[in-house]
């Protein structure tokens, strides 16, 4: 990236706007416009999309398919884990089958697309002709323009409130977490549940689809499911950021504050949260103040089947019990309906905000998705017991259903905020997490209800305090202002079936007898369902369990694992399970880290997950050392320092036994989510022989490929070459002089390309772009060569580089004969057709040496 260019090229433009995706694939311009769709087909296209593409431009939209998965089998499963697994299996299989024909159509037309399984929808970018063709398809139900969805507007106190603390970020703020509760906590009688039932949400996992969470906030860190209890964190399966705003290693973040605030109301310590001993996980479905539909869909999928931070290797068995959604839209689009149905079928209780579009009088101001009939929507009231002026009323503007379902405290709610601070905010966003936390208390106190959505809603409604306001319809007991009334979780729990046994215990050091805090206690029933609690500062734990037979396991750093098996509990039994754990010896762990070429890798970060030990950094010889590591098995993670180039993250196990451990490692090749990888290659320059008609500052030309070239699973017979060092497969473009990091979602519009040296380049009389083909059929190589390209902003020096396509392997090798600035202003890498995946070798880094090469190899996906 160099200095900004003049405004004549302020944004990228299509080189030939009349080209449709299908026309580009065929290599010809359509002679006439596509057939006008029938009235039936046109009705599938929403009006905003019709307007967006009417003038010849492109738009991004969602193609919703007619056929829907049958989730009745999932609902019939007995346990939460079984429900989630069955729902995931059915949804994935159904999407793969029903989307196959549409995907084939799009691939044939060289149209990039992103497929979702939880809502059976496909995200596509295209023009009017493509939209019309899709509308004609019999398998398509509707085509909806992509719209940004805003977070609920909240009223925030200008004053950030900081409670008295002796702890810092990353440290649990107290052993018990009890203080004078916030007004909303006492108003719904959560504090009375703590006292009367000795229940704070133990064994329940709450999730959030929001702006993220400050995971190491002192009042949230202990409850994070990714907290290993020893100072380390496992973020895979516990935090997901489809927006790409958080660090690439999966570390949770919150760049807005909304998500941290709502999470605090659910599980925060010091009287802030309703269920302070529940665990939490989160999906960052909202980039900041806005939430993109594709990120909300990805987040919705992750809730049902959590993945690693790359969105891979789904685990529906790790799905949360409850999910909070404090966001919505006032356009009355039935967005997210399929996701709500999937969550409900999987036994995941969802709480949704009724919205802040009310004025205290007007009816039908609730917003989606809370306004949908299948949603459990929450209105807001203040500390005087009055309905909030902003709270959304029913009946639903979407389907006429009664809304909200219930109301909770939502005015002047103090909770956690990024920067390890606190803020006071108002909105139905603040009311909704009161309900999510209340369900955690209910399910912890009455575990026979876990996963039973209808029964749980009925108990919440029955326990609520009626408020008579029928000006928007309804009755004194259930109306479109208050729903079933004010949340009273104590009464709901009083009404719940109390068949649970109560297990308490204390974990101590066998040698000294001292109490052991932060010991993980896993309790597994005969069906394999696991509930987890962590010991408090005094080594104690407590967990309500249904009658049955269980196995207990106890684990913590520096101690041998303990267990108790065959523990049979009767209904309402009080049972004590104490245990003393044996300290383990410590040993040295050391080794050498090598890069992908086998050379010593200096500056790499080496950490042992599952220990409280600080990470160490490799020296100039690639060596690392931990002086004392307790016996046990730990996750060994090696992260290369920037620039990482083709060096990937190493993940393995370090089993520390009876002596010192020498563990040498070689990091793997980096890969993207599609399985493409890169590696340094042997430099073997191929000179060009045939000139391409390119010249000047911004120009592009389409070249025929001598053999089919696959790019992210799609085969191409032609590609567009630009002066700015790009090979585009989707379109002939100019104006992409401002390079960006990869992947490129939402940036510049450039997608589906290879970037040998994406920079602001220009071709003068001393420059050229050429092609050449070598070898025989089956083993040919095709090179696109940029000779002596100048830098567009007057930077001294030039660049000569090429992209070489290998027919035999499908790989592409990028070679660099001479690059004056060594890539200091360029992007090198590849990106997929939707801009959602890519593999970046470098971005604005001086890492390209003359006479070097890097090869990108196709993945299996």
Which stretches of residues belong to each language-model region?
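C-terminal subdomain of the subtilisin-like protease fold in secreted/lumenal serine endopeptidases
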Residues: 313-324, 444-506, 532-537, 563-570, ...
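Extracytoplasmic Ser/Thr/Pro-rich, glycosylation-prone low-complexity segments
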Residues: 648, 660, 666-861
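Short, acidic Ser/Thr/Gly-rich low-complexity loop/linker segments typical of extracellular
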Residues: 514, 524-544, 600, 610-628
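Extracellular S/T/G-rich loop segment that most often corresponds to the catalytic His/Ser-adjacent loop
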Residues: 231-233, 240, 367-444, 486, ...
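Inhibitory N-terminal propeptides of secreted protease zymogens
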Residues: 34-160
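Subtilisin-like serine protease catalytic core
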Residues: 33-37, 56, 73-75, 136, ...
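Hydrolase catalytic cores
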Residues: 281-289, 408-477
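Protease zymogen maturation seam
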Residues: 35-38, 86, 137-205, 218-219
